[in-house]
Amino acid sequence: MQLVILPPDRDTITLVLLSNMPPDDREQWQLALDPDWPLRWRNYQLSRGPTGAITWRLSAAIREHYRVRINRLITGRGGRPGPGDRPYQYPPETARTQVLLLAQHLQRYPGLGGVRRDVYALAQHSTRVWQSTHPGQPYPHWPTMPYLPYRQPQTASLSELDGVLK
């Protein structure tokens, strides 16, 4: 996916997203930086970072999905236990392995600043849940999320973009 920023027109700046993947029901196109209804693309949403910089982060639905998965991996399979039974809980080594596999899976997301912050927040959530349910057991250490290398932005005149945008 590529982002094209067109020159300002009075009070607006037009952002054009180009993708080599056809759109499906996961895309919703609207005002890009609306905090209540952000631009979403696949598992990402466009947002502003703490310094006001525009960045991609994991969408709210995906962040909640991973929080629920972490809770289930650490605390058990879910569901109601039978009368007098304790809820099923994975043995600590199995739970640790499953959490680390999930952490490894999250490494496939790009290392953008917003995505890195979201994965770090998930790692902190995992540590808190682990320490509350497995006291005395060492918590799983998540791998460090790789940085996405910054590339020099490419510029083009509007006449060159005219054929691309039609």
Question: Which residues does each PLM region occupy?
Answer:
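Catalytic palm active-site di-aspartate
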Residues: 1-26, 43
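Helical (often loop-to-helix) elements that flank the catalytic cores of nucleotide-handling enzymes
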Residues: 18-39, 49
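Right-hand nucleic-acid polymerase module
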Residues: 34-166
